[in-house]
Amino acid sequence: MGFLVASAVLVCVTSQRVPGYCKKKPAVGPCKALIEKWYFDYSTQSCKTFYYGGCGGNGNKFSSRKKCREACLPKRPSVPVCKQMPDPGFCRAYMPHWFFNSKSGYCEGFVYGGCQGNDNRFKSCWQCMKKCRTAREANRLCWKLTKEFNKKFLRNVPTAKPLPPK
């Protein structure tokens, strides 16, 4: 009986094995660009951002959190995008975005900080509603929602003024 239990545990662990490149530390590379990428932090079993230099590096470099998770945590179940809570991330930029509120059933505004966060983040009401509801509902609701969004989030944002000609 003990042998059967040990075999079952071994099968479970090896079927969820993390690929070798996901265990490497992120490598910036020798170039000097600042390109936001994602890497898998093996010690915390999570995907995090880093700034890639633009050349070199290693395989632990992904264009999105989703791609990082798919590559390094392929068996882990995830919460559907439209059911995730809005996550502003840990940066402090002021970037108004949209998220789908599964309780109210429509898209609402929130302030994204510019990095991290989750996939329930959209640049427009239409993108949000088309992903989480339907295009027909997006056309019906987004004109009104966008007007409210602009009043709430864009009213006090300083606007750039053109420089006078020299």
Swiss-Prot record:
**Signal peptide, first to last residue:** 1-15
Keyword Signal annotated: yes
Q: Tell me the GO BP annotations in alphabetical order.
A: envenomation resulting in negative regulation of voltage-gated potassium channel activity in another organism
Q: Which organism is this entry from? A: Amblyomma hebraeum (South African bont tick)
Q: Which GO terms describe its cellular component?
A: extracellular space
Q: Where in the cell is it found?
A: Secreted
Q: What UniProt keywords apply to this chain's record, in alphabetical order?
A: Blood coagulation cascade inhibiting toxin, Disulfide bond, Hemostasis impairing toxin, Protease inhibitor, Repeat, Secreted, Serine protease inhibitor, Signal, Toxin
Tell me the function of this protein.
Answer: Thrombin-specific inhibitor from tick hemolymph (Ki=20 nM).
Q: Which GO terms describe its molecular function?
A: serine-type endopeptidase inhibitor activity; toxin activity
Q: Which PROSITE patterns does the record associate with it?
A: BPTI_KUNITZ_1 (PS00280), BPTI_KUNITZ_2 (PS50279)
Identify the residues that the record assigns to the BPTI/Kunitz inhibitor domain, covering every copy.
22-72, 82-132
* Coiled-coil residues: none
Record flagged with keyword Ribosomal protein: no
Q: Which Pfam families match?
A: Kunitz_BPTI
Q: List the disulfide bonds.
A: C22-C72, C31-C55, C47-C68, C82-C132, C91-C115, C107-C128
Q: Under what name is this protein listed?
A: Amblin
